[in-house]
């Protein structure tokens, strides 16, 4: 069985060497979809009986690990010295230094890397993170797959 939940956040970024407007500082209303697979929990006394995982727990983990960290932040590539220097001069600015250029593809892969260890097989139901889908716009997204 697979389950999917969706969370949204706002963040800024830039693609430093991009040939078009994406090289400029700009932002998006991102959506993050998390797909997990596992057996339906059969333990009758468990609050999660009949579920793969409680959606509220799926969302809480994603919020704490990724969404709250990235929401209303500027995601900047660690080697984008010009923008990093600028952001470091802004008092109390929420900056996330990214290991790679923060494209939709790299953001999806980074979210997958972060979340993979967060979703534990607590009930022995073979819980597994299958996919992280990151929407940069309503019509454009990237999938990071198991």
Protein language model annotation of sequence segments:
Residues 1-146:
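Charge-rich, low-complexity N-terminal segments
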């Amino acid at each position: 069985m697979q389950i999917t939940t969706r969370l949204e956040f706002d963040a800024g970024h830039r693609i430093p060497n991009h040939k078009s407007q994406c090289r400029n500082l700009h932002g998006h209303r991102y959506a993050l979809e998390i797909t997990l697979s596992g057996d339906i929990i059969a333990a009758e006394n468990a609050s999660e009986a009949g579920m793969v995982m409680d959606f509220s727990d799926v969302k809480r983990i994603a919020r704490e690990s990724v969404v709250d960290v990235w929401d209303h932040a500027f995601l900047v590539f660690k080697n984008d010295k010009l923008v990093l220097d600028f952001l470091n001069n802004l008092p109390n600015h929420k900056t996330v230094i990214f290991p790679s250029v923060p494209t939709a593809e790299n953001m999806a892969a980074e979210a997958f890397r972060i979340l993979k260890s967060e979703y534990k097989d607590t009930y022995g139901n073979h819980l597994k993170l299958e996919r992280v889908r990151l929407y940069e716009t309503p019509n454009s997204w990237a999938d990071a797959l198991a």
